[in-house]
From Swiss-Prot:
InterPro entries: CXXC4/CXXC5, Znf_CXXC. Residues 11-27, 36-50 have a biased composition (Low complexity). One of its GO terms (biological process) is regulation of generation of precursor metabolites and energy. GO terms for cellular component: cytoplasm; nucleus. The CXXC zinc finger mediates binding to CpG-DNA. It is found in: Nucleus; Cytoplasm. Keywords: Cytoplasm, DNA-binding, Metal-binding, Nucleus, Zinc, Zinc-finger. This is CXXC-type zinc finger protein 5. Residues 1-10 have a biased composition (Gly residues). Zn(2+) 1 binds at C257, C260, C263, C290. May indirectly participate in activation of the NF-kappa-B and MAPK pathways. Required for DNA damage-induced ATM phosphorylation, p53 activation and cell cycle arrest. Involved in myelopoiesis. Acts as a mediator of BMP4-mediated modulation of canonical Wnt signaling activity in neural stem cells. Binds to the oxygen responsive element of COX4I2 and represses its transcription under hypoxia conditions (4% oxygen), as well as normoxia conditions (20% oxygen). May repress COX4I2 transactivation induced by CHCHD2 and RBPJ. A motif (Nuclear localization signal) lies at residues 251-256. Interacts with DVL1. Interacts with RBPJ.
Amino acid sequence: MSSLGGGSQDAGGSSSSSNTSSSSGSGQKAGGTDKSATVAATAPASVADDAPPPERRNKSGIISEPLNKSLRRSRPLSHYSSFGSSGGAGSMMGGESADKAAAAAASLLANGHDLAAAMAVDKSNPTSKHKSGAVASLLSKAERATELAAEGQLTLQQFAQSTEMLKRVVQEHLPLMSEAGAGLPDMEAVAGAEALNGQSDFPYLGAFPINPGLFIMTPAGVFLAESALHMAGLAEYPMQGELASAISSGKKKRKRCGMCAPCRRRINCEQCSSCRNRKTGHQICKFRKCEELKKKPSAALEKVMLPSGAAFRWFQ
């Protein structure tokens, strides 16, 4: 019995010891689990602090890393915003960062307003420059127009002066009314009738009482025919006056033209018969005689006055 009781006691002691050991073991395990829980609770904060920040990529997809090692723990602005932070410490840090972000945003807005104002000034300056350039171009065009008008007035004045001089020359060469039987009105009527009958090659001479046939055109120049002195008789007898002018021009003493090679010679040959008989014949050197003077008078001059008032041919 004693042995059985001792065995039971031993069994009870062992059981109690096992219970105590199990309880102590369970208590140690519980303490271990509590410590591991605290370590696990503190570990994520340290790991979160030591963990590298998330990769930042710009629009091109390039990773933007901080330039300095002290900036490795930097966080984006959204991390510190009121929407992203929920904890107490996180809320405090988020509040400070939010204040900084607000200050930065205010400075950026101020800079943006300054830039906008500068851009507005820059935009306004080109418009003002464009307006000033347009005004300058208009002024230059106006000055050019005034210059052209002044030049036109000057040319008109010169033309008027030339016409006045031509009228004076015509009045000096034409006979007076007292000496001639007819005056300027009769000659104007004749010139107008001729202009109506035939088209003249001198359209600008219609304003003056001059018939183009009065002008003798030679290579040496243009001369007035001698028939201008008999202008009075042309109104009454135009054909007779024409014939008289042709005869008188044929009898007129001719002069050297001064254009041909013999006229340009300045030295006599002293060998021809004219040079040998100079004292008796009073003839010019044969090598210096004008080519026009060698021709006959009838061939030298064409018809001076044409009945239709048309232009006459050049002398050949």
